[in-house]
UniProtKB/Swiss-Prot annotation:
PTM statement from Swiss-Prot or TrEMBL: Ubiquitinated. May undergo monoubiquitination; monoubiquitination is inhibited in response to cellular stress, such as ultraviolet light (UV) radiation or heat shock, but does not cause its displacement from centriolar satellites.
Entry keyword set: Activator, Cell projection, Cilium, Cilium biogenesis/degradation, Coiled coil, Cytoplasm, Cytoplasmic vesicle, Cytoskeleton, Nucleus, Protein transport, Transport, Ubl conjugation
Stretches for region Disordered: 1130-1152
Function statement: Involved in early and late steps in cilia formation. Its association with CCP110 is required for inhibition of primary cilia formation by CCP110. May play a role in early ciliogenesis in the disappearance of centriolar satellites and in the transition of primary ciliar vesicles (PCVs) to capped ciliary vesicles (CCVs). Required for the centrosomal recruitment of RAB8A and for the targeting of centriole satellite proteins to centrosomes such as of PCM1.
Localisation: Cytoplasm, Cytoskeleton, Microtubule organizing center, Centrosome; Cytoplasm, Cytoskeleton, Microtubule organizing center, Centrosome, Centriolar satellite; Nucleus; Cell projection, Cilium
Source species of the chain: Bos taurus (Bovine)
Gene encoding the protein: CEP290
Chain coiled-coil ranges: 1-25, 52-121, 172-292, 318-528, 559-592, 627-688, 736-1441
Protein name per UniProt: Centrosomal protein of 290 kDa
Major subcellular site: cytoplasm
Length: 1468
């Protein structure tokens, strides 16, 4: 039994172990499966998000190919653009060269004319020299007269030529301005359209932007989505881990349950055995019979049966339970499969959508890869607009400068002419033979008047010729226009005739068909006739019957013959008409060809005539006003001529219409006459045939009826029948012709009616056109009249301006110049006097200041003359002298500042004076140079006069102009140099006060840094003294202001006087000085405020906080050590725990809660300490800086002390040296001041180095208390915030708490097992409990880490808020000021960087911008080409209608050429 029991126990234990192992294995496999599924899903997501290598390589290849293609296209575009640019450049050069050629040719022509005039004059002189054989005196007189006349003639001719050139030039400029205006208008229109397009695009872009913004507002940012995804992944991982842990725990719990059930069963079986054994023992004790054995066995059987029944019931219940579980598992598996399928499909859909989205994104990227962003486009548009505006401005400036240049040239020429006239007058007045010269001039003037009259007559003749030629041209134009109209009409007529010809051909073909049919019919009739003739009348019949039959047949034949004859004639007439029409058409075509050829020959001749006339009209010498008047007259005349032409054309059309109608009427009449004649002829023929027939009939009747018909009779009959047949044929043909003629007549009537309607329509149209043209011409005439009135007004204004100019020029320039020079000299003298007065006043001020200082020092020293020892004086009077020395120092500083300001003003005034003197000297030099140049010019004039006496005045006006131009250029260069010097001086003047100001500020800062403690103590005592000093200084200021006001008044008067010379530099200088002074005052005020704040702050915060920081460090270290110790204790308690009793677990739970509380407390303390540390770290560098400053102060004071001691030693040594009493007194005073300073600084050092005074201690304690209160407030605030955070995060922790409670319940169930007394079972239970506890511990540690992490996050969030609450408002102010200063510096740096960036951007500008510009250029060129084509069409139309149009293309080309090349001014 024992063995069996042992084996039973072993097997049961093995079963238990096997079950546990199998369960564990199955759990592991399930967990592995779940983890694998999760990992596979994660990997699948990664794969879905990623792209395959093949696709990537494909995309890279496509990208590379696209980039290569794009590069090639760009290179090609660049090449094309370069080519087009080169071509345009060459075209422009060609045009400019052509223009230069033309200008050179014109100049050559002018020079030829001039040469011709000179040769004529020379020939006249030679003729006169040869012819005159008079006396010598007379010869000399005549020669001089001839020379003067010839000079004047040549001068007049030169003037004429110059005026011609001017007129041509003005005409060119007028045309150029017109074209430029047109271009500007076109450009404006284009810009407006572009602007409209841009606004539309901008609006669309704004809408799109708004849409995108709305979408963005609705959407989530990428960072948030990425964070959410990561969080989801982490949550999924944690979920999987928790599932794994739950499955493990379930397995453990299942195993424990099974073991408990097995143990219960074993216990029950043992109890039963014990009971059975007891009963057996009792039975044995009672009796040992066989009956008793049987009964016992029976009892045993009964008990076994009962146990079997119970076991069967249990088995059945277990089987039912199993069935239920299997059904439940099947359902769950079905649900799982369905869910997995749904998941699979959802994933598939998601992948497909993701792929589709990626593809769309890639395609969109490819589409919009090269697209420019809106910001860049806006930049480009802005830059374009700016460039265009700059270009327009530059163009305007160019035009203005050119106009000024021309006006100056004209003035110089006028001045030269006047100079020459004046020189002639002066020479005549100087000569003794003045009267003779006057007489000779009088004679010359009379001759010139005669010549003028002749020239006027010639001019009148020329004008008449021009008018005649204009009339001829207008006639030619009229003829050309009429011929063109005729050509057009003939072309139309020819086309109509061609159409008619085609129609007639078709009709003739039809007629041919008809004739063929008729022929066939005639043949049939002939056959019938033959048959009829063949069938003679029956001879059996009586003769009268036979005759009647014969007569009937003859009549029919005659009728047929007549008809055929008529048709034949009508056909012949039609043939003739058609032949005549053909001839006419051929003649018309030939005449048209001839006319066209003649016109082609005439057109170039007329063009040449027009050119000649234009050149002739250009050569006319008239001023601008006359020219404009003439142009207006010409245009009016042209318009009238056009009107006349139009009227003549209308008349011609009317005449043509009347002719056409007459022709139509004549044709109709002819047709009617022809019809009448035909009818008469037919009637005559019919009458003749009837009479003949009657005669023949009577002859037959008269003849005897008896004779038998012979062969002759038969022959006669046959002949008669033939004639009858012929007549019938002719009659039939005539009938057909009649029908045709009637049809033709009807057609002709229809055609004539149509033509009449067309002519009437034409007439109406022409009348309407004529009315419109008349209205237009009237409007143009009115416009031209307005223009005439305006031009007359302009001419009057020009005349008045000319008169004023003449009057202004008549005044002698030398006298004005002298007056100006004298004025300038007087102003200079006044300025020098003012300068001297100011310098005297300044010297007096300085002297007064020094005297006052000396008097104060003497008074100070005279009080202490009695005292011999310096040490005793220092000991007694330190306190008394302290305040006085400080006051004096302050006074000295103020006086120094006042001196510096006065010096600055002095410097500015001296600089102004120097500038004025320099300018005056420069102007005097320039005036001297001008005088010298004038003398040189006079000498050159004299030389030229001598040359002119030898030769005739030809092309020798050029050197003068060249010299003048060189002079002007030199003067301009000098002016530029002077301006640059002025600018430099102004910059230096601005720089000097800035440097002085910076140096002064540095000195003041250093001195005030040394005296910041003493100033606070002595401020109250010094207020009254300062007020007195302020009063004195205000008085001084008022006096100085009065002086300055006087100086300003004098300056204004001087400026008014000097306005004629244009001196305005003083004003600029004064304004700049005032601005600089204002800025200085503002900066001083700001400096003083800042210094006061800094001193206040330093007084408050000059506490050594090193001890506080050290205390905080020690506290931190102690707390950290405590934390470490607590953590170690925790770890020991976790591992070394007694595992026998269930009470320990409760203790452990309580301990854990206490530890958590302690941990929270420690973390809060840690946070506080960290805050304190951060504050200390922030204060550390400031305190270090303070210590450093104090050390430097100490060292500096030591050095000063040593120096003072050295000086004292020297003073003691040189007491008995050969110095005067006042010098010694001064030195003693200075020494006193130095010693007082040293004592003060020593006291300060003692205070600093020694223990803190009671007041400072009290302050420190107060601050400490404040800081503690703030710390407590912070703690409270932090506690509130943490409680808020914990409340918000309580929901998250509730789940973890619930899981913990569930685990604790399971732990309690496990602890019940610990009460079992057996050793093996308790050990296993303890191991399981350990596992469970470790799991719980690990979970709690995780919770703890999470809580710590959350606390740190909250600390980080609340960190900046908590650090703000600093008590000292002044510190905040100083910090604010410092930050403002830093921000200003940063802004400056930022601005500099931005400027550099902008420069770099300008240097490295995008090539796309230039490409856009080149595209615009290309478009512009294409538009120009289109414009040229349209202008050519316009020209053709204008030539057709005889309207003159100036081509805007030519004008634009001229404009471009003038832009590239300077304007070719005419040579005077």
């Amino acid at each position: 039994e024992r063995q069996l029991r042992k084996e039973n126990g072993k097997q049961k234990n093995e079963l238990m172990a096997m079950e546990a192992e199998v369960g564990e294995k199955i759990g592991r496999l399930q967990r592995f499966k779940e983890m694998a599924v999760f990992k596979i899903a994660a990997l699948q997501k990664v794969v879905d998000n990623s792209v395959s290598l093949s696709e990537l390589e494909l995309a890279n290849r496509q990208y590379n190919e696209l980039t290569a293609k794009y590069r090639d296209i760009l290179q090609k575009d660049n090449m094309l653009v370069q080519r087009t640019n080169n071509l345009e450049h060459l075209e422009c050069e060609n045009v400019s060269l052509k223009e230069q050629m033309e200008s050179i040719n014109k100049e050559l022509e002018i020079t030829k004319e001039k040469l011709h005039t000179i040769e004529q004059a020379w020939e006249q002189e030679t003729k006169l020299g040869n012819e005159s054989n008079m006396d010598k005196a007379k010869k000399s007189v005549t020669n001089s007269e001839i020379v003067s006349i010839s000079k004047k003639i040549t001068m007049l001719e030169m003037k004429e030529l110059n005026e011609r050139q001017r007129a041509e030039h003005s005409q060119k400029m007028y045309e150029h301005v017109k074209t430029s205006l047109q271009q500007v208008e076109e450009r404006n229109f284009e810009l407006e359209t572009k602007f409209a397009e841009l606004t539309r695009i901008n609006l669309e872009a704004q809408k799109v932007e708004q849409m995108l913004r709305d979408e963005l507002a609705d959407s989530v940012s990428k960072t948030v989505s990425d964070a959410d995804r990561q969080h989801i992944l982490e949550l999924e991982k944690s979920e999987m881990e928790l599932k794994v842990e739950v499955s493990k725990l379930k397995e453990i719990s299942d195993i424990a349950k099974r073991q408990v059930e097995i143990l219960n069963a074993q216990q029950q079986s043992r109890e039963k055995e014990v009971e059975s054994l007891r009963t057996q023992l009792l039975d044995y004790q009672a009796q040992s019979d066989e009956k008793a054995l049987i009964a016992k066995l029976h009892q045993h059987v009964v008990s076994l049966q009962a146990s079997e029944a119970a076991a069967l019931g249990k088995v059945e219940s277990v089987a039912s339970k199993l069935q239920k579980v299997e059904a439940h598992t099947l359902r769950l598996e079905q649900k799982l499969d369905e869910k997995e399928q749904a998941l699979f499909y959802a994933r598939l859909e998601g992948r497909n959508r993701a792929k589709h989205l990626r593809q769309t994104i890639q395609s969109l990227r490819r589409q919009f890869s090269g697209a420019l962003p809106l910001a860049q486009q806006e930049k480009f548009s802005k830059t374009m607009i700016q460039l265009q505006n700059d270009k327009l401005k530059i163009m305007e400036e160019m035009k203005n400068s050119q106009q000024e240049h021309r006006s100056l040239k004209n003035k110089t020429l006028e001045m030269e002419l006047k100079l020459k006239g004046l020189e002639d007058l002066i020479s005549t007045l100087k000569d003794a033979r003045g009267a003779q010269k006057v007489i000779s001039w009088h004679t010359k003037i009379e001759e010139l008047r005669l010549q003028e009259l002749k020239l006027n007559r010639e001019l009148v003749k020329d004008k008449e010729e021009i008018k005649y030629l204009n009339n001829i041209i207008s006639e030619y134009e009229n003829t050309i226009s009429s011929l063109e109209e005729e050509i057009v009409q003939q072309n139309k007529f020819h086309e109509e005739r061609q159409m008619a010809w085609d129609q007639r051909e078709v009709e003739l073909e039809r007629q041919l068909d008809v004739f063929d049919r008729q022929q066939s019919e005639i043949l049939r009739e002939a056959q019938k006739f033959e048959e009829a003739t063949g069938s003679m009348p029956d001879p059996s019949l009586p003769i009268p019957n036979q005759l009647e039959i014969a007569l009937r047949k003859i009549k029919e034949n005659i009728r047929i013959i007549l008809e055929t004859q008529a048709t034949c004639r009508s056909l012949e007439e039609k043939l003739r008409e058609k032949e005549s029409a053909l001839r006419l058409a051929e003649e018309n075509i030939l005449s048209r060809d001839k006319v066209i050829n003649e016109l082609r020959l005439r057109l170039p001749a007329t063009a040449e005539q027009e050119k000649l006339l234009a050149e002739f009209s250009r050569k006319e010498v008239e001023p601008k006003s006359h020219h404009t008047l003439k142009l207006a007259h010409q245009t009016i005349a042209n318009m009238q001529a056009r009107l006349n032409q139009k009227e003549e054309v209308l008349k011609k059309y009317q005449h043509l219409l009347e002719k056409a109608r007459e022709e139509q009427r004549e044709i109709v009449k002819k047709h009617e006459e022809e019809l009448h004649t035909l009818h008469r002829k037919l009637e005559l023929q019919a009458d003749n045939s009837l009479s003949k027939f009657k005669e023949t009939a009577w002859d037959l009747i008269k003849q005897s009826p008896t004779p038998v018909p012979t062969n002759k009779h038969f022959i006669r009959l046959a002949e008669m029948e033939q004639t009858v047949a012929e007549q019938d044929d002719s009659l039939s043909s005539l009938v057909i012709k009649l029908k045709q003629v009637s049809q033709d007549l009807e057609r002709q009537k229809e055609i004539t009616e149509l033509k009449i309607k067309e002519f009437e329509n034409m007439k109406l149209r022409l009348q309407e056109n004529h009315a419109d043209e008349v209205k237009k011409i009237k409007a143009e005439v009115e416009d031209l009249r307005c223009l005439l009135v305006q031009s007359q007004k302009e001419s009057q204004s020009l005349k008045s301006e000319l008169q004023t100019q003449k009057e202004a020029n008549s005044r002698a320039p030398t006298t004005t110049m002298r007056n100006l020079v004298e004025r300038l000299k007087s102003q200079l003298a006044l300025k020098e006097k003012q300068q001297k007065a100011l310098s005297r006043a300044l010297l007096e001020l300085r002297a007064e200041m020094t005297a006052a200082a000396e008097e104060r020092i003497i008074s100070m020293t005279s009080q202490k003359e009695a005292n011999l020892n310096v040490q005793q004086i220092v000991d007694r009077h330190t306190k008394e002298l302290k305040s006085q020395i400080e006051d004096l120092n302050e006074n000295i500083l103020k006086l120094k500042e006042a001196l510096k300001t006065s010096k600055n003003r002095e410097n500015t005034l001296t600089d102004n004076l120097n500038d004025l003197t320099n300018e005056l000297q420069n102007k005097q030099k320039a005036y001297g140079k001008v005088l010298r140049e004038k003398d040189a010019v006079d000498q050159e004039n004299n030389e030229l006069k001598r040359q002119i006496k030898r030769l005739t005045s030809g092309l020798q006006g050029k050197p003068l102009i060249d010299n003048k131009q060189s002079l002007i250029e030199e003067l301009q260069k000098k002016i530029k140099k002077l301006e640059s010097q002025l600018e430099r001086k102004v910059d230096e003047a601005e720089m000097k006060p800035m440097k002085e100001k910076s140096a002064r500020e540095e000195v003041i800062r250093w001195e005030e840094g040394k005296k910041w403690q003493t100033k606070i103590e002595g401020i109250r005592n010094k207020l009254k003294e300062k007020e007195g000093e302020v009063y004195i200084l205000t008085k001084q200021l008022t006096t100085l202001k009065d002086l300055f006001a006087k100086a300003d008044k004098e300056k204004l008067t001087l400026q008014r006087k000097l306005k004629t010379t244009g001196l305005t530099v003083d004003q600029v200088m004064a304004a700049r000085v005032l601005e600089s002074e204002k800025e200085l005052e503002e900066l001083k005020k700001r400096n003083l405020d800042l210094e006061n704040d800094i001193s206040y702050m330093r007084s408050h915060q000059a506490l050594p906080r090193d001890s506080v920081i050290e205390d905080l460090h020690l506290q931190n270290k102690y707390l950290q050590e405590k934390l470490h110790a607590l953590e170690k204790q925790l770890s020991k308690d976790a591992y070394s725990r007694p595992s026998t009793s269930g009470i320990d677990s409760d203790d452990h739970y309580q301990r854990e809660q206490e530890l958590q509380r302690e941990n929270l407390k420690l973390s809060s303390e840690n946070i506080e300490l960290k805050f304190q540390l951060e504050q200390a770290n922030k204060d550390l560098p400031r305190l270090k800086n303070q210590v450093r400053d104090l050390k430097e102060m100490c060292e500096f004071l030591k050095k000063e002390k040593a120096e003072v001691e050295r000086k004292l030693g020297r003073v003691r040594g040189s007491g008995r040296s050969g110095k005067t009493i006042p010098e010694l007194e001064k030195t003693i005073g200075l020494m006193k001041k130095v010693v007082e300073k040293v004592q003060r600084e020593n006291e300060q050092l003692k205070k600093a180095s020694g223990i803190l005074t009671s007041e400072k201690m009290a302050n420190i304690e107060m601050e400490n208390e404040k800081l503690k209160a703030e710390l407590e407030k912070l703690k409270v605030h932090l506690g509130r915030q943490l409680s808020m955070h914990y409340e918000s995060k309580a929901k998250g922790t509730e789940k973890i708490v619930a899981e913990n409670e569930r685990l604790r319940k399971e732990l309690k169930k496990i602890e019940i097992l610990k009460h079992v007394p057996e050793g093996d079972e308790t050990e296993q239970g303890l191991q399981r409990e350990l596992r469970v506890l470790r799991l719980a511990n690990s979970q709690l540690e995780k919770e703890k880490e999470e809580l710590i992490h959350r606390i740190e996050i909250s600390k980080d969030q609340n960190g900046p808020d908590s650090t703000i609450s600093d008590p000292d408002h002044l510190m905040e102010k100083i910090k604010d000021l410092e930050t403002q200063l830093r921000t200003s510096d940063m802004e400056k740096q930022h601005l500099k960087e931005e400027i550099q960036k902008l420069k770099k951007e300008l240097e490295n500008f995008d090539p796309s911008f230039f490409e856009e510009i080149e595209d615009l250029k290309y478009n512009y060129k294409e538009e120009v080409k289109k414009n040229i084509l349209l202008e050519e069409k316009l020209k053709k139309l204008s030539e057709q209608f005889g309207v003159e149009l100036t081509s805007p293309v030519a004008a634009s080309e001229q404009f471009e050429d003038e832009q590239e090349n300077p304007v070719n001014f005419p040579i005077y």
